[in-house]
Amino acid sequence: GTITTASVAGANFGFALIWTLLFSVIATILLQSMAARLGVATGQDLAQALRANIQTPLFKSLAIFLVISAIGVGSAAYEAGNLSGASMGLIGIFPNVNPQIWTPLIAFLSAGLLYSGKHKVVENALIVLVILMSLVFISTLIMASPSLGDILSGFTPSLPEGSITTVLALVGTTIVPYNLFLHSGVLAAKHDSKSDLQKVIKQTNVDTSLSITLGGVITLAILSTASVGFYGTNAGQISAANRAVQLEPLLGD
């Protein structure tokens, strides 16, 4: 989802929406830091804290609805995007295979991996893939050598015509609501009344800021390479079939 959204943003609007990434990164750091402090200080995750502190039945029902929307619907939409993205990649590699088989096949294989309990294998494989992807996009950005002035101009807030949905998509793929519940839950599980809570919170804030900032830099690289490859060129509209154009400065035709 992030790759597709950032690529579309760069291809259609150049560097004009970089400010959205900056806003999203700062907002995500603040929100996840608050969720982390809640988990560390109280030993409760965000859902438990909502249940314990909201007494009015109407507000409690509303909170339950919002939590279900953030975790259930949000996760389903996120995974649907992942499956669709993986399917589009395989369609490009195997154009003669019926494209309708890929999404259910990937879903079945993913469920099998989770059911096997070998989560560490999946985690390590994903880490390797993310590192490789990050290196490719950042290296491509360096080789493409876009104008620094154009990049810096993108930090000035603006809304080009037709960009509002892309802005919302960039924010939505960065500020992920269910991550707030996950983050607070992970920290709540580590809660220890004997620990130096201030030290734990400080370390958590540092880790959160570094990881989210790194993610923002990678997203910036994706947006920028798409801008160089598509915006103002004859490459046409970006699609699953021609998205590799943005990587040509590094990988060639």
PLM features: residue spans?
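Transmembrane helix-boundary motif of multi-pass solute transporters/channels
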Residues: 1-24, 238-242
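Flexible loop linkers connecting adjacent transmembrane helices
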Residues: 6-8, 34-59, 88-90, 233-248
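Juxtamembrane transmembrane-helix boundary signature
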Residues: 20-54, 67-74
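Extracellular/periplasmic helix-exit of transmembrane alpha-helices
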Residues: 29-41, 187-191, 195, 213-242
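Hydrophobic transmembrane alpha-helices that form the core helical bundles
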Residues: 61-95, 103
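Transmembrane alpha-helical segments of multi-pass small-molecule transport proteins
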Residues: 65-68, 93-115, 132-141
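Membrane-water interface regions at transmembrane-helix termini and the short interhelical loops
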Residues: 84-93, 106-128
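Hydrophobic alpha-helical segments and their helix-loop junctions in multi-pass secondary transporters
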Residues: 130-156, 171-185
